[in-house]
Amino acid sequence: VQNVFGVCRGGLGLKGLAAPACGCGGLGYEGLGYGALGYDGLGYGAGWAGPACGSYGGEGIGNVAVAGELPVAGTTAVAGQVPIIGAVDFCGRANAGGCVSIGGRCTGCGCGCGSSYPY
């Protein structure tokens, strides 16, 4: 079982080094904030430690256990089954491609049916 409880945002990465010195590329999205020292930095994205050191990203073969919230931005591909015990809350769109089976009950989602019919 692999426990997912944090996130590695990385360090100084290629996008930050190649981006302009200030503005959107320097201290903003791909500079010292989100890209260079953040999400796409040394650990996670297109940086150096990702391919060389295998940074933590909550992926692997086996089971993944999540306690708390697991926010996901971007695309997440899941191959296999995802059994869920408890409640799942989607804020926004939840697009699914392929075959999706959902078993559960309508428990006050706001649709007005109030049905206990399993679907």
UniProtKB/Swiss-Prot annotation:
Keyword terms: Repeat, Signal
Organism: Antheraea polyphemus
Region of interest (Right arm), residue spans: 103-119
Functional note: This protein is one of many from the eggshell of the silk moth.
Intervals holding Sequence repeats: 28-32, 33-37, 38-42, 43-47
Region (Central domain): 54-102
Protein's name in the database: Chorion class A protein PC292
Coiled-coil regions listed: none
Signal sequence extent: 1-6
